[in-house]
Curated annotation (Swiss-Prot):
Keywords: Host cell junction, Transport, Viral movement protein. It comes from Peanut stunt virus (strain J) (PSV). Pfam families: 3A. The keyword Ribosomal protein does not apply. This is Movement protein. GO terms for cellular component: host cell plasmodesma.
Length: 288
């Protein structure tokens, strides 16, 4: 059957059943699991001395082969205008160091095509980060869409390549890289205006700022009082409870807090006093 009409018309000829098959391939539990375990999508990857060069494909080979077969079947049946392309609009990577700031070392991160035997960077999509520059955010934008084809014994696909340099005396992890992207597949392809890889240095988080406000100081003092009498762990911003030594009761320092219904209990008539006799090791006068 010869092609007739536009490629859009040919694409629309694909049956709903075939489209459902493609959705099952892309969103099956196995595919989602492999995107995490084999591609590290949205996960933190630690760079160690024994993993100095890391290559992470942006689509698992199993999923890529199934998608390529789906497009090939539609192409040979005359329903699709091509054997399929993988489209990656952008790759974002958050990089943080996991060693002291004066450690001598650097990271080279770039986007590559697994169809290239030398695995060279694609159109200046490469960034070098020194340890002292971290943390940082980097971004990559491919200038073309990748054909769904076999090159030798592997599927052609975009990949993030990370190389660790230096860091003598640091055999463990020296940096953490968390990457995110959204692969798309289409029967059409395009070329894109070249844009250099982006690099944005991020100011380290100032966690001391949380302790500079008056309310933070009050919470700190109350937590210190609480720690002297009871090894309770208190979440930030929650009501702080004080436990008396030698007593099973707990008294809230914030008297305005309303107790939920399940915390309200009836005091026994045999009780001499509802207040503890000893608080923080100081005996309360007038108690038995």
């Amino acid at each position: 059957m010869a092609f007739s009409g536009s490629s859009r018309t040919l694409t629309q000829q694909s049956s709903a059943a075939s489209t459902d098959d493609l959705h099952k391939i892309l969103f099956s539990p196995e595919a989602i699991k492999e995107m995490a375990t084999k591609c590290d999508l949205g996960r933190h990857h630690w760079l160690r001395a024994d993993d100095a060069v890391c290559v992470r494909p942006l689509v698992p080979e199993t999923t890529s082969n199934k998608v390529a077969q789906w497009f090939k079947t539609g192409y040979e049946a005359g329903k699709l205008p091509s054997k399929g392309y993988m489209i990656i609009p952008q790759v974002l990577c958050a990089v943080t160091r996991t060693v002291t700031s004066n450690a001598e070392g650097s990271l080279e991160i770039y986007l590559a095509d697994l169809g290239d035997v030398e695995l060279a960077p694609i159109d200046d999509q490469v960034v070098t980060l020194h340890n002292r520059d971290l943390p940082a955010l980097i971004s990559f934008q491919p200038t073309y869409d990748c054909p769904m084809e076999k090159v030798g014994d592997r599927s052609r696909c975009f990949a993030v390549v990370i190389k660790r340099h230096g860091y003598l005396g640091h055999p463990g992890s020296t940096a953490s890289v968390c990457s995110n992207w959204q692969p798309k597949f289409s029967s059409k392809n395009n070329n894109y205006k070249p844009a250099a890889a982006g690099k944005t240095l991020v100011l380290p988080y100032n966690r001391l700022s949380e302790l500079s406000g008056p309310s933070a100081v009050v919470r700190l003092l109350k937590s210190q009082l609480n720690m002297q009498s009871s090894p309770l762990f208190q979440l930030p911003g929650g009501p702080i409870m004080q436990k008396a030594i030698g007593s099973e009761r707990e008294e809230g320092l914030n008297c305005k807090r309303k107790l939920p219904l399940e915390e309200v209990c009836t005091t026994s008539r045999d009780s001499v006093s509802s207040r503890p006799s000893v608080v923080n090791g100081i005996e309360r006068p007038g108690t038995l």
